[in-house]
Curated annotation (Swiss-Prot):
It comes from the Bacteria. Belongs to the ABC transporter superfamily. Lipoprotein translocase (TC 3.A.1.125) family. Part of the ABC transporter complex LolCDE involved in the translocation of mature outer membrane-directed lipoproteins, from the inner membrane to the periplasmic chaperone, LolA. Responsible for the formation of the LolA-lipoprotein complex in an ATP-dependent manner. Its EC number is 7.6.2.-. GO terms for molecular function: ATP binding; ATP hydrolysis activity; transmembrane transporter activity. The lineage of its organism: Bacteria, Pseudomonadati, Pseudomonadota, Betaproteobacteria, Nitrosomonadales. One of its GO terms (cellular component) is plasma membrane. This is Lipoprotein-releasing system ATP-binding protein LolD. It is a peripheral membrane protein. The complex is composed of two ATP-binding proteins (LolD) and two transmembrane proteins (LolC and LolE). Keywords: ATP-binding, Cell inner membrane, Cell membrane, Membrane, Nucleotide-binding, Translocase, Transport. GO terms for biological process: lipoprotein localization to outer membrane; protein localization to outer membrane. It comes from Nitrosospira multiformis (strain ATCC 25196 / NCIMB 11849 / C 71). The keyword Cell membrane applies.
Amino acid sequence: MSDNIISCRNLRKSYYQGQIEVPVLMGIDLKVGKGDTVAIVGASGSGKSTLLHLLGGLDVPTGGEIRILSHEIAGMGEAERCELRNRSLGFVYQFHHLLPEFTALENVAMPLLIRRMAKAKAYESAREVLQQVGLGHRLTHTPGELSGGERQRAAVARALVTRPACVLADEPTGNLDRRTAGEVFDLMLELNHDAGASLVIVTHDPDLARKAGRTLHLEDGLLTV
């Protein structure tokens, strides 16, 4: 079995405007091993988010191959891809996507409850991860009662609570001030390292990208070093 957590070969993605094909990704090759931290940078509209969605099984490619833990996902149905995502991956987005009517504890426990974990055990795991991200004192607060940095920390906790093999992060600090962005980014690197998980992060900030183990540039539909 391959040691790669995520890999893709000759990955291609096009969209269509009527009969006109608009290519976005034109032959991406990428391997993400266990514990790797990879930053992907590129101009707005270069296809960074599209690539991340494909790597996470949230979209299907026009051509090429994607494997998550050696499972080829192109031939999977949506239910099978969803199960693989929930079991193997964590996601963090620029906007936290926390459910506003639920507390931080309830939001972070949600992925475990979706897995049908017992409520008490799910809450125990969520509480532990929230303490790790510095929110042990904010368990009963809703997203509206948290600061921007705290909401993003809760989103990081939610991504890590399932102990994923890899976290995919799409501009996770893009909505934060520079100091808070640096703190959240450092926290993600630290927690992923401690958990032995891989991290693929899309960012427009070259200073943050340089903290990753590997930085790749997406331009003209291709990844370069």
